[in-house]
């Protein structure tokens, strides 16, 4: 069991090495203006999304 977890961690680390910094910034939204994500209704700050997804954990 422990060995399979180590192998999985190594796989994930190898996948992250293949991602370029620019690609990562685009996926995470770091290139957006000041952390604001435009939506249909209004601009939501990333902190709002983080609160919604982590408030009940």
UniProtKB/Swiss-Prot annotation:
<feature type="cross-link" description="Lanthionine (Ser-Cys)">
    <location>
        <begin position="41"/>
        <end position="55"/>
    </location>
</feature>
<dbReference type="GO" id="GO:0005576">
    <property type="term" value="C:extracellular region"/>
</dbReference>
<keyword id="KW-0929">Antimicrobial</keyword>
<dbReference type="GO" id="GO:0042742">
    <property type="term" value="P:defense response to bacterium"/>
</dbReference>
<keyword id="KW-0614">Plasmid</keyword>
<keyword id="KW-0883">Thioether bond</keyword>
<feature type="propeptide">
    <location>
        <begin position="1"/>
        <end position="30"/>
    </location>
</feature>
<comment type="function">
    <text>Lanthionine-containing peptide antibiotic (lantibiotic) active on Gram-positive bacteria, such as Lactobacillus sakei, Leuconostoc mesenteroides and Pediococcus pentosaceus. The bactericidal activity of lantibiotics is based on depolarization of energized bacterial cytoplasmic membranes, initiated by the formation of aqueous transmembrane pores.</text>
</comment>
<dbReference type="InterPro" id="IPR007682">
    <property type="entry name" value="Lantibiotic_typ-A_Lactobact"/>
</dbReference>
<keyword id="KW-0044">Antibiotic</keyword>
<comment type="similarity">
    <text>Belongs to the type A lantibiotic family.</text>
</comment>
<keyword id="KW-0964">Secreted</keyword>
<dbReference type="GO" id="GO:0005102">
    <property type="term" value="F:signaling receptor binding"/>
</dbReference>
<keyword id="KW-0078">Bacteriocin</keyword>
<dbReference type="GO" id="GO:0031640">
    <property type="term" value="P:killing of cells of another organism"/>
</dbReference>
<protein>
    <recommendedName>
        <fullName>Lantibiotic nukacin</fullName>
    </recommendedName>
</protein>
<feature type="cross-link" description="Lanthionine (Ser-Cys)">
    <location>
        <begin position="48"/>
        <end position="56"/>
    </location>
</feature>
<keyword id="KW-0425">Lantibiotic</keyword>
<feature type="modified residue" description="2,3-didehydrobutyrine">
    <location>
        <position position="54"/>
    </location>
</feature>
<feature type="cross-link" description="Beta-methyllanthionine (Thr-Cys)">
    <location>
        <begin position="39"/>
        <end position="44"/>
    </location>
</feature>
<dbReference type="Pfam" id="PF04604">
    <property type="entry name" value="L_biotic_typeA"/>
</dbReference>
């Amino acid at each position: 069991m422990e060995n399979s977890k180590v192998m999985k961690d190594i796989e994930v680390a190898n996948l992250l090495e293949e991602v370029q910094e620019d690609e990562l910034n685009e996926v995470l939204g770091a290139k957006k203006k000041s952390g604001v994500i435009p939506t249909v209704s209004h601009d939501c700050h990333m902190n709002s999304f983080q609160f919604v997804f982590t408030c009940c954990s």
